[in-house]
Amino acid sequence: MPTLKELIAKLPKAELHLHIEGSLEPELMFELAQKNRIPLPYKSVEEVRKAYSFTSLQSFLDIYYAGAKVLLTESDFFDLAWAYLLRCKAQNICHTEIFFDPQTHTSRGVSFETVIEGITKALEKGEKELGISSFLIMCFLRHLSESEGFEILKSSLPFREKILGVGLDSSEVGHPPSKFERLFLECRKAGYKIVAHAGEEGDSSYIWEAIHKLQVERIDHGIRCEEDENLVEWLIQKQTPLTVCPLSNVKLQAVKNLSEHNILRLLRKGVLVTVNSDDPAYFGGYLNENYEALSEHLNASKEELKALAINSFKASFLSEEKKMDWIKQII
């Protein structure tokens, strides 16, 4: 009889909420800083790890943006994405839908083309050599203006075939989805799939706004949906997925501790919830560690872990045929 940890390791899984910049491990950060002669405010890898003690989304974002400064060349972005794909292979992540934040890089003088070419070359190699399928989702930084978002949308159009969808991330409170309503209308016209972070630090009204104002196909986080019973019922009825990130929620104190997390409660109610790692280099765990945490702290059963893995494919942007191919392997 395999243990739950062994079951998690063997389960085919999709990851739908992963920021590629958030997979930058301290070792690679140091290596790229030396190569590119970028000064870091840390003397060692250990010092960086110690600095990863955040108490809020904002304190995390401060170090996240500082770390991203080491990414300058196409090969840097390739190395970053390739390192994540090797983790995927080790954890039996068969499909991944990756967020990237072009504004984090274009604001530093790195071209959109440099970012997208480096990442997509790694993704192409990942499909060919590792058998991992993937899609790219471009995120707009919500603490910036909508007009800046329009500039990035324009920059993305020559690379339209490399980007499946668009999302919305960064500091949530004070930057509701409605701030970007016109931008997301244009994104829909361009044929992009639509997702958005909502209901992590922002209340349930942010989730409603993402649904009605942005017309999202998926909600990233969404854990505060339980503040509104009508919203929970809507999510169940429409089967709009939530890409939940348990270890991230605890690290950023959106949830006090894992034993209080609502992911399994939502699953049992019939909400289409999935498990994801968010920014794993910063939050102390990749996808399997998030599944293991649910087993350890919430006593997730074998059937619940399998249901979450099935949901990861159901909630993906894969074709129905490919979704079923993976789901059959889990059932």
UniProtKB/Swiss-Prot annotation:
Entry's EC annotation? 3.5.4.2
Q: Which UniProt keywords apply?
A: Hydrolase, Metal-binding, Nucleotide metabolism, Zinc
The protein's matches in InterPro entries, at most eight in alphabetical order, are given as: A_deaminase_dom, ADE, Ado/ade_deaminase, Metal_Hydrolase
Leader sequence segment: none
Q: Does the keyword Metal-binding apply?
A: yes
Known cofactor(s): Zn(2+)
**According to its UniProt record, which reaction does this protein catalyse?**
adenine + H2O + H(+) = hypoxanthine + NH4(+)
Cofactor note from UniProt? Answer: Binds 1 zinc ion per subunit.
Residues bound to substrate are 279
Query: What's a single GO MF annotation on this record?
Result: zinc ion binding
Gene Ontology, cellular component aspect: cytosol
Into which EC class is this enzyme placed?
A: hydrolase
Q: Does Metal-binding show up as a keyword for this record?
A: yes
Q: Which GO terms describe its biological process?
A: adenine catabolic process; hypoxanthine salvage; nucleotide metabolic process
- Amino acids binding Zn(2+): 17, 19, 197, 278
Q: CDD domains from the entry?
A: ADA (cd01320)
- Positions of the site: Important for catalytic activity? 221
Location of the active site: 200 (proton donor)
* PANTHER family cross-referenced by the UniProt entry: ADENINE DEAMINASE
As for family, the record states:
Belongs to the metallo-dependent hydrolases superfamily. Adenosine and AMP deaminases family. Adenine deaminase type 2 subfamily.
Q: What does this protein do?
A: Catalyzes the hydrolytic deamination of adenine to hypoxanthine. Plays an important role in the purine salvage pathway and in nitrogen catabolism.
Q: What is this protein called?
A: Adenine deaminase
